[in-house]
């Protein structure tokens, strides 16, 4: 199961800050989340490309803003993971500065896919991201990642709790369960990306039947 647009994603460039980003036009959707929430794995599954975004067992390896081009108008963007403590303080501040510059200034940014581990409640920094994007009026779609590690009941409970929080405080955000390992939730996240990218999938033509 592949998506006709996102399977075409190819690495474009990495930028340490806003001034090194590609030209600001078209449609971009950025992927954000805590450094161990499964962001790179999700990107690889969504694009059906195992090695597109580099995964690592060491959280915090994504230190640059990484751009992947789907077509001439549309890009996916892998943002630096936030909230990881075991990095140099100056490095951490530089990441946060480039992250905030990109999210606040980038006019082609149409939405944010945000990773939250389904096995635990959102952290303080996750909630700060939701508060921040709310003030910017930036749409957010949350992937409750690693949902395959939960049984069906606890997974649904995690989804309902997050949905209730969003309904009460964050009307700009939506949420779904997602598993990179089991490839669960792909259709839902593809539909959200299509909406933000203003992309219509080609309709497969039906073979003509001969009249008798």
From Swiss-Prot:
Domain of life from the UniProt record: Bacteria
GO cellular component: cytosol
Sequence positions that bind Mg(2+): 40, 62
One of the record's GO molecular function terms: GTP binding
Positions bound to GTP: 33-40, 60-64, 78-81, 145-148, 178-180
Biological role stated in the UniProt entry: Necessary for normal cell division and for the maintenance of normal septation.
HAMAP family referenced in this protein's UniProt entry, alphabetically: GTPase_EngB (MF_00321)
Stated name of the protein: Probable GTP-binding protein EngB
Underlying gene: engB
